[in-house]
Amino acid sequence: MSTLGAAGAALLTPGKLRASTAMPGAVDGRAASGGGRLALTGLGSTGDIYGELGVTPIINAAGTYTTMGGSLMAPEVMEAMRLGNENFVSIDDLEVAAGKKMAELCRMPEGYTGLVTAGAAAALLVGYAAILTGDNKQYIQQIPDLTGMPKSEVIIQKSHRYPFDHQIRQNGVKLIEVETRDELIAAINPRTAAMHFTNFLNDAGQIKVDEFVKIAQQHNLPAYNDAAADTPPISRLWEYTHMGYDLVTFSGGKDIRGPQAAGLLMGKQDLIRCALLNMSPQEDTIGRASKVGKEEICGMLKALEMFVASDQDAILKEYHAQLDHIGNAVGQIPGVTAQYQYNATAIANVTPRLAVSWDPSKIALTSRQVTQQLAATRPYSIMLAGDGDSKQPPQNPTIWVTAWMMQPGQENVIAERLSEILKSGAKAS
């Protein structure tokens, strides 16, 4: 385990990195003491709640990974959640109102609305439940047992199978795999409930996103597009509903930076109404466990409002500057090269990254060793995507640094620590 130098350690004093973005008032609305924070006793009293719990905080140079907490919410989002906590409210009424606000912000077509769910995976669960049950109370209480129900199959391209189709299958349906347009059409039968499209796998399948929904419309079948990680660009929020997809989902806690336990389900009003019937606060439903609270709903709407109004070009410039700083630092080490990479036409996780490579004849380290040493840094662990690719050719070790979830100032820490690690592996000349 390695610790940062004096400069890096000073920067990472608990709470220091984000002190400039702290809300001026206390979390619960009462007068705050010292620096705009509510004075706590017991847990949280040091300002370093993770340290008190014995958990190592992370500098996230990887991306919006759920395993690391997704993203960090803006102070405005936290304030909206605080306001949502000030009163009791009918959750059903709040969801309906939230859906109307989502429709406005996301420029939905006439007849569409939205629903705040407990994440994108929960949106898959309750969205497909809505397709299967409608508003039939018996069916709602019965699924995932589909005995006696008219629909039990969902068509999906074989190349679009992915870990999150578990949430589709959780409803009891059978996934019917197809590869070609002809196979898709041949697979449609009276038991077909819907057609599923995995948006980030668009290039992997023979049937593309626009053609897929047209086929569904021609056969009067609902089409569901899972676009969970597919913002930015902001326009993705309305692109697929205007294509005609009946249901579309996005993660709330990735680039939109809403609560991590929140997601967005958009779709035709009747389907959204039935999705709400299949989830909390309703009891005896498949979605009861996927509870979303009033605070998450309010925070999610505020985050969405801010995301739609955000200046993505300015944000990209900030990312570029952070990665340039790291690249300039490590690029001075003999044998090391750093290259800025950005694919604006990518479908999912569209964000810049810095590829750092080195000549193994000059630096005797593998990419996995560098990644592991970064992760072992203290007091903050520096996490990259993956653990170093063991399949990389040994003559070209490379790691990737992402600025997406990096906080201001953390580029200095990464530059210092990564330079230290690479220099430690330098071979004597």
What are these regions (language model features)?
Residues 1-17:
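N-terminal export leaders
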Residues 304-328:
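Structural signature of PLP-dependent enzymes
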Residues 88, 202, 230, 407-408:
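Short strand->helix junction
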Residues 384, 426-429:
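Conserved short beta-strand edge segments in small beta-sheet-based binding/regulatory domains
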Residues 3-7, 21-59, 64-68, 99-104, ...:
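Conserved PLP-enzyme active-site core in the AAT-like
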Residues 56-92, 98:
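Glycine-rich phosphate-binding segment of PLP-dependent enzymes
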Residues 83-85, 199, 358, 403:
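Short glycine-centered, acidic/aromatic-flanked micro-motifs in structured strand/loop junctions
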Residues 49, 331-420:
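Conserved C-terminal alpha-helix-loop-beta "cap" of PLP-dependent enzymes
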